[in-house]
């Protein structure tokens, strides 16, 4: 589970032992700070300047944080500290601290271990979505835009497994194989958000990548860029739980015949639940389902669903609604194809 740690309150325990183990790994490094400078560090927040002056900290790594509860276990455990990987560990530590210690809070998400990743791959689950579908950061534009981009100032829950089935039907003249091509089924994982916000139910955020489904026979033989679609038609995406229960069926009509060769675009569909507030008389809209699909037009004029697709959904039925409530569907196409 993700956790938050305050950078100004985390203290450095066993400072002397920590310095000794790290210093032994950098016996050939002349730029390593002297012991007196290290001992003056009283908290994690003071390590920002210390790491910023250390060479080789241009890139950040999401899988290691020096201020996590495992920091002393990593550096104090002689079995885990080896001369071969010590400089690499310390560089990752310094890079991440230099980037994140400027803020008030730091987030540490547990990386997927090898056994868990192997288990997910054996089930056919796209581990790309598990590692990249969510990033904790500030809002980007509106709340909806932040959901679609995956940047939210809240922690994520444990991953949940889902599956999605993609199909398309053609509304234009095309090859017979594109009139109703075989469906493509993809397993993926989705997160829910965890935040201290009253009366707010966060939806699930999932991401699946078409190009990485190399084990699928359809992808190997017929769709090198992703899932090929006709220029005009209607996409059907069926979202299911692992037990086969259907959560939502997305029907996305589209027309990308105006796309030029070697261009990209996206389609976004949003489903709102609108309610009339009895007190204020205003109409309140709540995003319940969302879908963002990326489309590419190759140099040969073929259209594909490609790369990563994002989906937003809730696991509650919208049926049985009554009173001043209605469901509104909205489909958007990027300006390049309008």
From Swiss-Prot:
Taxonomic superkingdom: Eukaryota
Signal peptide: none
One of the record's GO cellular component terms: cytosol
One Pfam family recorded for the sequence: DUF4210
InterPro entries reported in the protein's UniProt record: Atos-like_C, Atos-like_cons_dom, ATOS_Transcription_Regulators
Protein name: Uncharacterized protein C3H8.04
Native source species: Schizosaccharomyces pombe (strain 972 / ATCC 24843) (Fission yeast)
